[in-house]
Amino acid sequence: VIGGDECDINEHPFLAFMYYSPRYFCGMTLINQEWVLTAAHCNRRFMRIXXXXHAGSVANYDEVVRXXXXXFICPNKKKNVITDKDIMLIRLDRPVKNSEHIAPLSLPSNPPSVGSVCRIMGWGAITTSEDTYPDVPHCANINLFNNTVCREAYNGLPAKTLCAGVLQGGIDTCGGDSGGPLICNGQFQGILSWGSDPCAEPRKPAFYTKVFDYLPWIQSIIAGNKTATCP
């Protein structure tokens, strides 16, 4: 996260960290004891998922690591378009217990409204050159825009996507924050999919997969319908 501050240790009990190698990682959101939600483009064959992590250098006493038991991507996703249906549900190999630093974030009950102030968070780059990564996650506030702002900036916007950022630039998600949550008015509304390169450019908000539009799919998969298709 560019232009943010260190997150409070108690602010992100639902934020999980997926690592595949030291240089490749993503954010994830715990939505119940056994499932996390992230971006489809974060999918890797062998991944480790750490819940209750804060500082990379010092483990929280309740930090846990899980592997993925099964990963679910929309069967109707266009494989060669990163931003199409960029959402993935992962079932953990064993459930996690709620603790001081572990608690799921519930799915949204309403869609977000344009103009909302939204919170972003992650262990991603804190410099636009993407050469500095923090030991603890950084948090910042950004704004939810009308989708036309992104359509004008990038000549288009995928369906079921939110457009969020800061028009003057300087505050944004960045490399390594992918898959992490966009939280608007306390509700889990978006999953970081894609943004400008370099990050935090003026008038170039980022794309967040709109969680609300995928609720039927998410609920079907969790209920055991493994072949549910996305809207």
UniProtKB/Swiss-Prot annotation:
<comment type="subunit">
    <text>Monomer.</text>
</comment>
<dbReference type="GO" id="GO:0005576">
    <property type="term" value="C:extracellular region"/>
</dbReference>
<keyword id="KW-0325">Glycoprotein</keyword>
<dbReference type="InterPro" id="IPR033116">
    <property type="entry name" value="TRYPSIN_SER"/>
</dbReference>
<feature type="active site" description="Charge relay system">
    <location>
        <position position="41"/>
    </location>
</feature>
<feature type="disulfide bond">
    <location>
        <begin position="118"/>
        <end position="184"/>
    </location>
</feature>
<keyword id="KW-0800">Toxin</keyword>
<dbReference type="GO" id="GO:0030141">
    <property type="term" value="C:secretory granule"/>
</dbReference>
<protein>
    <recommendedName>
        <fullName>Thrombin-like enzyme leucurobin</fullName>
        <ecNumber>3.4.21.74</ecNumber>
    </recommendedName>
</protein>
<dbReference type="GO" id="GO:0004252">
    <property type="term" value="F:serine-type endopeptidase activity"/>
</dbReference>
<feature type="site" description="Required for specificity">
    <location>
        <position position="172"/>
    </location>
</feature>
<dbReference type="InterPro" id="IPR043504">
    <property type="entry name" value="Peptidase_S1_PA_chymotrypsin"/>
</dbReference>
<dbReference type="InterPro" id="IPR001314">
    <property type="entry name" value="Peptidase_S1A"/>
</dbReference>
<keyword id="KW-0964">Secreted</keyword>
<keyword id="KW-1015">Disulfide bond</keyword>
<keyword id="KW-0378">Hydrolase</keyword>
<dbReference type="GO" id="GO:0006508">
    <property type="term" value="P:proteolysis"/>
</dbReference>
<dbReference type="InterPro" id="IPR018114">
    <property type="entry name" value="TRYPSIN_HIS"/>
</dbReference>
<comment type="function">
    <text>Thrombin-like snake venom serine protease that cleaves Arg-Gly bonds in alpha-chain of fibrinogen (FGA). Induces temporary episodes of opisthotonos and rapid rolling around the long axis of the animal (gyroxin-like effect), when injected into the tail veins of mice (0.143 ug/g mouse).</text>
</comment>
<keyword id="KW-0645">Protease</keyword>
<dbReference type="InterPro" id="IPR009003">
    <property type="entry name" value="Peptidase_S1_PA"/>
</dbReference>
<feature type="domain" description="Peptidase S1">
    <location>
        <begin position="1"/>
        <end position="223"/>
    </location>
</feature>
<keyword id="KW-1199">Hemostasis impairing toxin</keyword>
<feature type="disulfide bond">
    <location>
        <begin position="150"/>
        <end position="163"/>
    </location>
</feature>
<comment type="similarity">
    <text>Belongs to the peptidase S1 family. Snake venom subfamily.</text>
</comment>
<feature type="disulfide bond">
    <location>
        <begin position="174"/>
        <end position="199"/>
    </location>
</feature>
<dbReference type="GO" id="GO:0090729">
    <property type="term" value="F:toxin activity"/>
</dbReference>
<keyword id="KW-1204">Blood coagulation cascade activating toxin</keyword>
<keyword id="KW-0720">Serine protease</keyword>
<feature type="disulfide bond">
    <location>
        <begin position="74"/>
        <end position="230"/>
    </location>
</feature>
<dbReference type="InterPro" id="IPR001254">
    <property type="entry name" value="Trypsin_dom"/>
</dbReference>
<dbReference type="Pfam" id="PF00089">
    <property type="entry name" value="Trypsin"/>
</dbReference>
<feature type="disulfide bond">
    <location>
        <begin position="26"/>
        <end position="42"/>
    </location>
</feature>
<feature type="active site" description="Charge relay system">
    <location>
        <position position="86"/>
    </location>
</feature>
<feature type="glycosylation site" description="N-linked (GlcNAc...) asparagine">
    <location>
        <position position="225"/>
    </location>
</feature>
<feature type="active site" description="Charge relay system">
    <location>
        <position position="178"/>
    </location>
</feature>
<feature type="glycosylation site" description="N-linked (GlcNAc...) asparagine">
    <location>
        <position position="146"/>
    </location>
</feature>
<feature type="disulfide bond">
    <location>
        <begin position="7"/>
        <end position="139"/>
    </location>
</feature>
